[in-house]
Amino acid sequence: MATFKSLTEADLLSFSTGLIAGVDEVGRGPLVGDVVTAAVILDPNKPISGLNDSKKLSEKRREALFDEICDKALCYQVGRASPAEIDELNILHATMLAMQRAVAGLNIAPELVLVDGNRSPIFVAHNGAGLTSHSIIKGDGLIASISAASIIAKVTRDREMDVLDAAYPQYGFAKHRGYPTKAHFEAIAEHGVFDQYRKSFKPVKALLGL
């Protein structure tokens, strides 16, 4: 019997009569910006070659696949949680909320939702129907729809960091993407933090004396 580690969308579709949405997140670790998630329902009649965990792909390849996913997927949706929501809920619960928003925003209700990682929130479709979901450890490298979601989320967040970099070039967001690097620590020590920072994260709390 197949296990989740070896299941593909084709395997899963043989067990169900409906469509599958893959879900993944990007941006749990950075000190600044939204945590970004994506939900993708791929079209089984329009396969996309080269899908993989977004972290294992070059930026150029991610960008190309992003465009192909947007063109060929049956539907996709980005969901997010803001720094204020992260501070209020904590990063785990904010990530679950962002995933729920992504799935609820799909204009097609999937029969099954597959989430990268070791936990899954309760999902409700745009029409209010409850959805079955499963979490799959390292699913972004195993299940095509989760790989696609990881690419959509990663490219979306990277582009947002580029916008933030243009507004605040002294922080170097285009290089470190908001993650807690030495260069980033030096930048916030010199320039302080602004409203897009996650004030509940230890390095930011320490700087603010909270």
Curated annotation (Swiss-Prot):
One GO CC annotation: cytoplasm
InterPro entries: RNase_HII, RNase_HII/HIII, RNase_HII/HIII_dom, RNaseH-like_sf, RNaseH_sf
GO-annotated biological processes: DNA replication, removal of RNA primer; mismatch repair
Reactions catalysed, as given in the entry: Endonucleolytic cleavage to 5'-phosphomonoester
Subcellular location: Cytoplasm
EC numbers: 3.1.26.4
Cofactor: Mn(2+); Mg(2+)
Pfam family, one: RNase_HII
Disulfides per UniProt: none
Keywords: Cytoplasm, Endonuclease, Hydrolase, Manganese, Metal-binding, Nuclease
Family: Belongs to the RNase HII family.
PANTHER family: RIBONUCLEASE H2 SUBUNIT A, RIBONUCLEASE HII
Protein name per its UniProtKB record: Ribonuclease HII
The gene coding this protein: rnhB
